[in-house]
């Protein structure tokens, strides 16, 4: 069983549609308190902090059947980088509209940090109890936006969707109509690269 260290409905939906058994557990990590040297460093650090926070919570649980079934934890964090500036979720309508007016007909990069903790197999065939295995990587996908009118921008912002997503857009939602194309992993833009997770799960289970 996989633990998703996130309350993100988008990430939960990705795993559910892919048929990956999992449970969600909120990490409680304060995302505003992190120092970072780059966007890549930020999402890498935050994804690992989220996974380790859930790891600590699991260690406090009694060794019941549920906790014994858990063999891996994944933490993720995403930001959108546009013209060298890091965009998280827009704080208000004015900021969301301003961003969209800047992004119209241009492109940026959605970065998602992935931190996968797992219980490696020991020589006796049992699994390590403390999630000492770690695989982590930042995946980047370029997103190109359509040439949008002011009316299209304000209409999209009025749906409320931009306030739920890094960068202020949801590829899996209404924002899809405002995107011309992507270069890279589709699910990474939604918040979790499924091809990357498949490789991590394969390594953890071997």
What are these regions (language model features)?
Residues 3, 38-206:
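Anionic-ligand binding patches
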Residues 10, 30-32, 122:
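Surface-exposed, flexible loop/turn segments at secondary-structure boundaries
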């Amino acid at each position: 069983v996989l633990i998703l260290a996130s309350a993100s409905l988008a990430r939960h939906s990705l795993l559910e549609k892919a048929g990956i058994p999992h449970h969600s557990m909120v990490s409680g990590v304060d995302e505003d308190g992190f120092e970072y040297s780059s966007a890549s460093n930020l999402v890498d650090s935050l994804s690992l902090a989220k996974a380790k926070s859930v790891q600590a919570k699991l260690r406090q649980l009694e060794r019941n059947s549920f906790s014994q079934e858990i063999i891996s934890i994944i933490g993720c964090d995403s930001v959108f980088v546009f013209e060298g500036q890091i965009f998280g979720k827009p704080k208000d309508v004015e900021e969301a509209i301003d961003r969209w007016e800047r992004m119209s007909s241009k492109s940026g990069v959605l970065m998602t940090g992935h931190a996968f903790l797992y219980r490696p197999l020991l020589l006796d065939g049992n699994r390590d109890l403390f999630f000492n295995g770690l695989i982590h990587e930042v995946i980047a996908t370029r997103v190109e936006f359509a040439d949008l009118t002011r009316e299209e921008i304000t209409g999209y912002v009025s749906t409320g969707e931009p306030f739920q997503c890094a960068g202020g857009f949801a590829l899996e939602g209404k924002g899809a109509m405002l995107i011309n194309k992507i270069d890279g992993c589709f699910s990474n833009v939604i918040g979790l690269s499924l091809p990357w997770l498949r490789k991590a799960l394969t390594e953890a289970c071997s």
